[in-house]
Amino acid sequence: MEALVYTFLLVSTLGIIFFAIFFREPPKIQTKKIK
């Protein structure tokens, strides 16, 4: 169970950082490729 908790925290932290950078700086890649 601890492995799942640590994995969840790691993924959530990376996700928050990714979205923070994503919304802070507009991506140069076309939005169609992301969807």
UniProtKB/Swiss-Prot annotation:
User: Mind telling me which residue stretches traverse the membrane in this protein?
Assistant: 3-23
Question: What is the membrane topology noted in the UniProt record heading this document?
Answer: Single-pass membrane protein
Q: Name one GO cellular component term.
A: chloroplast thylakoid membrane
Q: Which SUPFAM superfamilies match?
A: Photosystem II reaction center protein T, PsbT (SSF161029)
User: Which cysteine pairs are joined by S-S bonds?
Assistant: none
InterPro entries assigned to the protein according to its UniProt record, in alphabetical order = PSII_PsbT, PSII_PsbT_sf
Q: Where in the cell is it found?
A: Plastid, Chloroplast thylakoid membrane
GO biological process, alphabetically ordered: photosynthesis
| Keyword match Ribonucleoprotein | no
Q: Which Pfam families match?
A: PsbT
Keyword set for this entry? Chloroplast, Membrane, Photosynthesis, Photosystem II, Plastid, Thylakoid, Transmembrane, Transmembrane helix
Q: Which domain of life is it from?
A: Eukaryota
Q: What does this protein do?
A: Found at the monomer-monomer interface of the photosystem II (PS II) dimer, plays a role in assembly and dimerization of PSII. PSII is a light-driven water plastoquinone oxidoreductase, using light energy to abstract electrons from H(2)O, generating a proton gradient subsequently used for ATP formation.
- Family to which the UniProt record says this protein belongs: Belongs to the PsbT family.
- Give the quaternary structure: PSII is composed of 1 copy each of membrane proteins PsbA, PsbB, PsbC, PsbD, PsbE, PsbF, PsbH, PsbI, PsbJ, PsbK, PsbL, PsbM, PsbT, PsbY, PsbZ, Psb30/Ycf12, at least 3 peripheral proteins of the oxygen-evolving complex and a large number of cofactors. It forms dimeric complexes.
Q: PANTHER family from the xrefs?
A: PHOTOSYSTEM II REACTION CENTER PROTEIN T, PTHR36411
Q: What is this protein called?
A: Photosystem II reaction center protein T
Organism name: Bassia hyssopifolia (Fivehorn smotherweed)
